[in-house]
Amino acid sequence: MTGSDLIGIMILAAGLFAVGVFGVLARRGMLFQLVALEVALSGPALGFIAAGAYHADPEGQGMFILVLTLAAAEVAVGLALFLRLRRLTGTDDSDAISGLKG
């Protein structure tokens, strides 16, 4: 892998992260926000893999597994919150959380 390949992949990783953050901020549905957060987490994961491949270092793969584990935990907690919010309010609007009492 050359330096220009690494730059291209890092630009792609930054783009994935930016699209994910925009999706989290722009969408009101909690399920869409969870999907956008997964897209945002895939950007740094791609960056770790690319940097590890460029430097011939396996630590990039280790960081990828860490990001993958964190993403799985985030999905589990997020889906549990989504189901609870949907049961309590009847909607998946994340703004409905502010109306909950107690």
From Swiss-Prot:
Function, in words: NDH-1 shuttles electrons from NADH, via FMN and iron-sulfur (Fe-S) centers, to quinones in the respiratory chain. The immediate electron acceptor for the enzyme in this species is believed to be ubiquinone. Couples the redox reaction to proton translocation (for every two electrons transferred, four hydrogen ions are translocated across the cytoplasmic membrane), and thus conserves the redox energy in a proton gradient.
Enzyme class, spelled out: translocase
EC number(s) per entry: 7.1.1.-
Membrane topology reported for the UniProt record: Multi-pass membrane protein
Protein name according to UniProt: NADH-quinone oxidoreductase subunit K
PANTHER family to which the protein is assigned, alphabetical: NADH-UBIQUINONE OXIDOREDUCTASE CHAIN 4L (PTHR11434:SF16), NADH-UBIQUINONE OXIDOREDUCTASE SUBUNIT ND4L (PTHR11434)
InterPro entries listed in its UniProt record: NADH_UbQ_OxRdtase_chain4L/K, NUOK/Mnh_C1-like
Spans through the membrane: 6-26, 30-50, 63-83
Gene: nuoK
Record text on subunit structure and interactions: NDH-1 is composed of 14 different subunits. Subunits NuoA, H, J, K, L, M, N constitute the membrane sector of the complex.
Catalytic activity: a quinone + NADH + 5 H(+)(in) = a quinol + NAD(+) + 4 H(+)(out)
Source organism, top-level taxon: Bacteria
GO molecular function, one term: quinone binding
GO biological process: ATP synthesis coupled electron transport
UniProt KW keywords: Cell inner membrane, Cell membrane, Membrane, NAD, Quinone, Translocase, Transmembrane, Transmembrane helix, Transport, Ubiquinone
Family: Belongs to the complex I subunit 4L family.
Species assigned in the record: Rhodopseudomonas palustris (strain TIE-1)
One GO cellular component term: NADH dehydrogenase complex
Location in the cell: Cell inner membrane
